[in-house]
Amino acid sequence: MLLLLLPLLLAAVLTRTQADPVPRATRLPVEAKDCHIAQFKSLSPKELQAFKKAKGAIEKRLLEKDMRCSSHLISRAWDLKQLQVQERPKALQAEVALTLKVWENINDSALTTILGQPLHTLSHIHSQLQTCTQLQATAEPKPPSRRLSRWLHRLQEAQSKETPGCLEDSVTSNLFQLLLRDLKCVASGDQCV
């Protein structure tokens, strides 16, 4: 009889104390299956071609405007590998969000069709990054490192200091670094060294 009551008593004690049978840090939330960032290790040739066409059209438009920008917001020296693996999705999410925001605000009817597919792809990537970073924050909340904080602050600050044309130039110049290097690195997780 005591053997039958022991599991019930143990369950009652664990429930009453709100103890977890497995430590939280090792358990993934149920929604974790919704994080599918690994699918972006490489984009399809069709998607890359659409981005190449959009980049070319935007660069041509900027040249016609004779845009002069003193610096690039997103430095070529910036490398996500400098961050801890778990911080990389947050940094990439900020880059993708900025690219989306800038490209969505381009008011040129000639570019509407050209930007359609790239904007759709960037939106999909951004939504996956949001899901992954939210799940990660829930599973293991940690404050961001100083390096990540500085980078995120710099991106935020540039949005208020830079002209729309220079922001456009910067995110467009950084596009293939974002798609081919940064996205692949985040999608590869701890295999990106």
Curated annotation (Swiss-Prot):
GO MF annotation list: cytokine activity; signaling receptor binding
Superkingdom as given in the UniProt entry: Eukaryota
Localization: Secreted
N-terminal signal peptide: 1-19
Entry's Gene Ontology cellular component terms: extracellular space
Transmembrane regions listed in the UniProt entry: none
Gene3D superfamilies: Interferon lambda (1.20.1250.60)
Example GO BP: positive regulation of immune response
Protein keywords: Antiviral defense, Cytokine, Disulfide bond, Secreted, Signal
Protein family membership: Belongs to the lambda interferon family.
Described function: Cytokine with antiviral, antitumour and immunomodulatory activities. Plays a critical role in the antiviral host defense, predominantly in the epithelial tissues. Acts as a ligand for the heterodimeric class II cytokine receptor composed of IL10RB and IFNLR1, and receptor engagement leads to the activation of the JAK/STAT signaling pathway resulting in the expression of IFN-stimulated genes (ISG), which mediate the antiviral state.
The protein, known as: Interferon lambda-3
Origin organism lineage: Eukaryota, Metazoa, Chordata, Craniata, Vertebrata
